[in-house]
Amino acid sequence: MARGRVTVLGRAERTGDKRQIERFLARHEEARGYATFKDFHFYRVAPTRAHLVAGFGRIHWIEGGALLCRGNMDALSNAESEILAHMNADHGEALALYAERLLGLAPMPDSKPWRMTGIDPEGLDLEAGGVTARLGFDQPVLDPDAARAELVRLAKLARSRQAGSDSE
């Protein structure tokens, strides 16, 4: 194992928070049919610390608070479902450009288009045909206006690149 790896330790806490449930289901559509079963429950992990192996001789323990986003992300979190709905309904081309030109992923067939499944201060999550991807932001975004500006910036950057090019 030459690559770095991290193990997150924490408390699993049952949750009924509708936003957390919708975030999970956006990423795991196949679970939606089971979500209303009486024996199906949702949990969140409250990190207490993490064990990082960053390479040979580079092993560290990290406190849980250092794993969490700094700053108030309530505004972005409250708007996440609307941002996802808007991007997926109106900006499918931009999502494909993010995946193909910024992340270097293969084009997907029209029957399985890229869709945004999440957004948080550090980046956005994409999914298409069972393939998932993460596109990080250069700077944290904490509210819908900052998210919009970053999504527009990324779309312009992606459009400026030739298909298959690495240059910015």
Task: Please identify what each model-predicted range represents.
Residues 1-33, 37-40, 47, 132:
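Short, structured beta-strand-loop surface elements
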Residues 35-168:
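C-terminal edge-of-domain segments
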